[in-house]
UniProtKB/Swiss-Prot annotation:
This is G1/S-specific cyclin-E2. Residues 1-44 are annotated as: Disordered. One of its GO terms (cellular component) is cytoplasm. Keywords: Cell cycle, Cell division, Cyclin, Nucleus, Phosphoprotein. The modification Phosphoserine is found at residues 21, 383. The modification Phosphothreonine is found at residue 392. The gene is CCNE2. Phosphorylation by CDK2 triggers its release from CDK2 and degradation via the ubiquitin proteasome pathway. Lactylated at Lys-348. Delactylated by SIRT3. One of its GO terms (biological process) is regulation of cyclin-dependent protein serine/threonine kinase activity. Essential for the control of the cell cycle at the late G1 and early S phase.
Amino acid sequence: MSRRSSRLQAKQQPQPSQTESPQEAQIIQAKKRKTTQDVKKRREEVTKKHQYEIRNCWPPVLSGGISPCIIIETPHKEIGTSDFSRFTNYRFKNLFINPSPLPDLSWGCSKEVWLNMLKKESRYVHDKHFEVLHSDLEPQMRSILLDWLLEVCEVYTLHRETFYLAQDFFDRFMLTQKDINKNMLQLIGITSLFIASKLEEIYAPKLQEFAYVTDGACSEEDILRMELIILKALKWELCPVTIISWLNLFLQVDALKDAPKVLLPQYSQETFIQIAQLLDLCILAIDSLEFQYRILTAAALCHFTSIEVVKKASGLEWDSISECVDWMVPFVNVVKSTSPVKLKTFKKIPMEDRHNIQTHTNYLAMLEEVNYINTFRKGGQLSPVCNGGIMTPPKSTEKPPGKH
């Protein structure tokens, strides 16, 4: 054997100090096996997360509607985010630009309450262009439907908040659908009111009463089916800050004195119903959806008070509401040309709450006057509201016996 071979053989033999005992070798081998198992387990968990997808399990009831879903197992798919174009609509929005006009509250932080209201305003989106999604619909159909819902609310002495919740549910639901047939509008409208009444009213009308006011057009089963469709489409987000909620807040903040009692109304009921009537008329026009509810309410308040009151009550500057104030001018002219609305007395409704009960007047005729004025303001011909085929609920004396 050569000297070189002897050196290589000696080098490959373990030195006495480097020799491992059998116990140490077993421990090292167990650690290696555990590490390998942990890595394999983590890979299996990641793979398992990617092995499921959502699939519709029921056929959609409406064209373009949202149906219930199930989670099913699928082959492994790698999830990547290579295309960021779909995130362009999600931009940071500064909600602190409007300081809180709320006074100190005994039951919470006024800044947090105000910020939560602004967040809701941004989350609950509405758009006047939703009729683009529905080729069979015309703007006056929405006006006729909402006018009918106003009348139903008065017949059953429902609160203004109930109507405005129903209006919000209807408008947001229509944004989630496509090509809704005009024959479905009454069902969607009365179901929206049914949902709103269960949220807002202490003694809400029964299901059969909502079916009754449609004069046989909608059955109880139809309303229940549509209720689930609407709730699913809205993702159960049913707590918007409505127009009438903003009006209550603004008038209350303006009326507060040195010792505020925020929980009890401090403002004039007469002032409230005058502005509420203007807002009732405005919301019938589909163009009102171009503005946030807060802006719309502040503009109405400005027409009946002053910009100083608006700044104090809402924290909004003139630049924020000027466009809406100008848009509202024809509505104000029509409202002020009619007899002033008066407080009504309702059975079983306390005097201090009567201004909160929704009332109805000949809003469609008033809206037609607004359209006539806008014809000259905008220099273009606007189609008037059609009075034909208006859905009319029964009179109070014609409600089903034993119902309320």
